[in-house]
Amino acid sequence: MAMATTALSASLPRLLPPRRRRFPTPSSSSPSAASTSTSRVVRLRAAAASAPSEVLDSTNGAIPSGKGGGGQQYGREYFPLAAVVGQDAIKTALLLGAIDREIGGIAISGKRGTAKTVMARGLHAMLPPIEVVVGSIANADPNYPEEWEEGLANQVQYDADGNLKTEIIKTPFVQIPLGITEDRLIGSVDVEASVKSGTTVFQPGLLAEAHRGVLYVDEINLLDEGVSNLLLNVLTEGVNIVEREGISFRHPCKPLLIATYNPEEGSVREHLLDRIAINLSADLPMSFDDRVAAVDIATQFQESSKEVFKMVEEETEVAKTQIILAREYLKDVAISTEQLKYLVMEAIRGGCQGHRAELYAARVAKCLAAMEGREKVYVDDLKKAVELVILPRSILSDNPQEQQDQQPPPPPPPPPPQDQDSQEDQDEDEEEDQEDDDEENEQQDQQIPEEFIFDAEGGIVDEKLLFFAQQAQRRRGKAGRAKNLIFSSDRGRYIGSMLPKGPIRRLAVDATLRAAAPYQKLRREKDRDKTRKVFVEKTDMRAKRMARKAGALVIFVVDASGSMALNRMQNAKGAALKLLAESYTSRDQVSIIPFRGDFAEVLLPPSRSIAMARNRLEKLPCGGGSPLAHGLSTAVRVGLNAEKSGDVGRIMIVAITDGRANVSLKKSTDPEATSDAPRPSSQELKDEILEVAGKIYKAGISLLVIDTENKFVSTGFAKEIARVAQGKYYYLPNASDAVISAATKTALSDLKSS
């Protein structure tokens, strides 16, 4: 276990920030908490004390339960959450998720060795056991029969007294592996049971195992897009509906989602992060003393874990009790309309899209109040909810205006003179009204913060929170679905099965057997010879659905005409070789199409071979006319042909030109037909080029225009080409191969994440 991280603690570290270290009793927390029944609290504390402390690990064997030794009371020898140095925001968020599993999930980003997984497993070990209905495949709660899976109501068992049979199990902890298929995630046909019974029997997936527990996804940014979308759809709905392979089944799925990822290995798509309530970073800076303490406690844990468990035993037990009691308080916590208005205004000022920010923030604020043993939401709860939910989603203003000192409003004019008796009566009334107003204002001050975290321009008022928000901005991905995978039925990684469309190239044996399993009993009865053990018919056949990483194709369209042609060709050659040298892992391909004279030619077809590129680019032809339209149209043809081959997901054309053309497209494609035709005007040539640029945009191809025209004679037409094609434009009259390569890589990176 890699415990030498910067987020591990020393010397009796605290699980919670100082304000929430202990769960307050009703008599000491707030007036609302004081009104809670004392017998209720005593009963809950007794239940918490008598509950078994073990926790359950998933039946998939991801985390086996430990036995014996000093750590047996904690399950396996996890690193206790109370021993983690710092990371108060993340630890608070994890406790909130333990209190309310349906809070919306928690995403933790951070570099390697920042205790992301350590904290997730540490929280799981603190969760109390759960009561489930005997025979349930999805950990059904006996108190909520309306949420049971289909068919369970007809299969439940009762004891001699007529009571529903239940059992106490450890809280599930299910980890989603990166290579998981949809069948294993949502469930599929149980082949063995279906063969024996002759009917279709459902085999639950990991989502059924995770219900009412913890669903942990490590490196969610590397999870397959289809799987991640399916996963979050099910968690959002709270129910898994399976309609496939003759199965029609549904079961509840409401676990606590904890997702972790390293932003250096790829960002998470923005729409996925938007569907997770709390998004925090573990990369916050630590002091020198904290880093020393982290190494110290990690070393102690490796040498003697019993001592570390003993150090934080009190903190851990308090937190366990706090979770149990807070779950009961949460049922009675209320949030006022004025408080909701405050959260909505913060979300608006922060530039949050949609309504998820304020919805999640309201739920978090209620959980914070329940954690303190209160039935009302206070100011600190609202502020903390904004920091945990709204702040990471905010769109920071690039140039926030400095706050100006606001002048107080002028005093009202003095009232007109009145007689003494009426003045005394009015003074008495005003004193009574003032007392009522003071009481109301005092109560109101406890519920609504005096100032917003965001100012009217979207900037952050509290400078201490600026770094926290900037971390969220850096790890935020971009919207959209990237074409980084190519799906086929013959090459790649097996990700699922599908009904065949024509001849089957690769048979999905597992899916075929699942489809045939329910009919084995009937087919055996019809078989008179009794010679076969498994009967598979053509209608049972399933083909493999494969996926492989798709590279991008960069097509350099280079103006090889004029006096500067040789420089442009040399720079394009250098940029192409630089891209090829770095394209081994990304599978990117490069092509070069120079245009000169009357037409363009493919000097280097799409290739990943550096040797081939050097051989093809050894001689660089230059001089002659400038058939720009033919160069761009040739690039479109090459790109579309490469896309049809199935090896390219994205196409980008890099046009290195001054935008000046003097050869028409018709002359390039059919020189004999235009031999006697009059020479086209400059405007006709421009219209022809812009028409080709429009076709580039319609074909879904990205265009990067590098303008090499001298600024003293510039016409700006190269920029117009980029505008029509919805592409990017750089004015680089003296660009070197390194500059062109850097500009291309930047545009290519944006293209892949768009």
Swiss-Prot record:
Q: Where is the signal peptide?
A: none
Biased composition annotated in UniProt, kind: Pro residues = 407-418
Q: Where is this region: Disordered?
A: 1-41, 397-448, 665-684
A single BP term in Gene Ontology: photosynthesis
Enzyme Commission designation? 6.6.1.1
Could you name the Gene Ontology cellular component terms for this entry?
chloroplast
Acidic residues composition-biased segments: 421-443
- Where does the sequence pass through the membrane? none
Q: Which InterPro entries match?
A: AAA+_ATPase, BchD/ChlD_VWA, ChlI/MoxR_AAA_lid, Mg_chelatase_ATPase-dsu, Mg_chelatse_chII-like_cat_dom, P-loop_NTPase, VWF_A, vWFA_dom_sf
- Where in the cell does this protein reside? Plastid, Chloroplast
Note the effect listed for residue 393 to Q: In chl1; yellowish-green leaf phenotype
- Main subcellular location: plastid
Q: Which domain of life is it from?
A: Eukaryota
- Identify its protein family: Belongs to the Mg-chelatase subunits D/I family.
Q: What is this protein called?
A: Magnesium-chelatase subunit ChlD, chloroplastic
